[in-house]
Amino acid sequence: MKKAIIAMSGGVDSSVAALFMKQNGYECIGATMKLYDNEDIGISREKTCCSLDDIEDARAVARKLCMPYYVFNFKDEFEKKVIDNFIKTYEQGGTPNPCIECNRHLKFEKLMLRMQELKYDYVVTGHYADIEYKDGRYLLKKGKDITKDQSYVLYSLTQYQLAHTIFPLGKFSKDEIRKVAEENGFINARKRDSQDICFVPDGDYSKFIENYAGKKYPDGDFVDKNGNVLGKHSGIIRYTIGQRKGLNIALGHPVYVIDKDLKNNRVVLGSNDDLNSSELLAGDFNWIIEKPNGKIKCMAKTRYNMREVPCTACCDGDKVRVCFDSPVRAVTKGQAVVLYDGEYVLGGGTIE
């Protein structure tokens, strides 16, 4: 009998994933990754995952499924690999996606190492995505429910990780999953979806960074493209490319953050048209398909919730250059670019 570790957050998705695996005859254990103590990072228990309530919800589902359940303490790794990187990226002028780093380093690295230690065969999660084995290679596919598709945050999976991962929800919609949970009497059937960034539930990234890092980031100048001073900003980490709201500056016309000058602690403002990019360079690129020799025509996403846009991609040394058929707005350092061909993920990397 094949054995699987179910990554359980206490939410409905991972709970139904556990149910499906049990129904398909796998020997399963449930595991919640304890990533941080809420009090340590200054947030209330009820606002986020990793709370005692979430652990109890996961434990209750595991008990209902007659499945052993464990809590794995990954706090040190989460701090080093996710939170420290989150702060560093903002300090370097980028806008990070911590969900990608959590998947890369915790769910599919640390948890998979635990899988190996326990001599289990698979890690199972409640992601809305799918895996297909075709022509000697494991391929990552979008989930059936496009409104919930999470393939964008999974591009970093290696061939080994794909071979030892199962996404049981890939062929279902969210409504179907909630219905299954209700039919099976799960206490979390109508539980709200978790926050995108679990450790900043109120969305105030700058406040979190200043509290966690224990320092205040200095004020500086807003400038235009020519370096003319337009006003004062309240700390460079408070701004991201494309931002218009919260600038607290009145110039008589709309302005947006178009760049950051870290050396001089300046935030550059410009027009909406100034945000358009015709190409980007991505590092730390992971090809899920075989690495192409030349240029490929495909589709790209530079943000989680954006519509795919047509492009041409090619390797450029150890990086990948992506040239868009039409200019793309607010391409942002630190975010991911993910390439698609229909329902298949070709690969992805970090925008530089």
Task: Please place each PLM-identified region on the residue numbering.
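AMP-forming adenylation/ATP pyrophosphatase catalytic core
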Residues: 126-131, 136-352
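ATP-dependent adenylation/nucleotidyltransferase module used to activate substrates
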Residues: 1-155, 166, 175-176
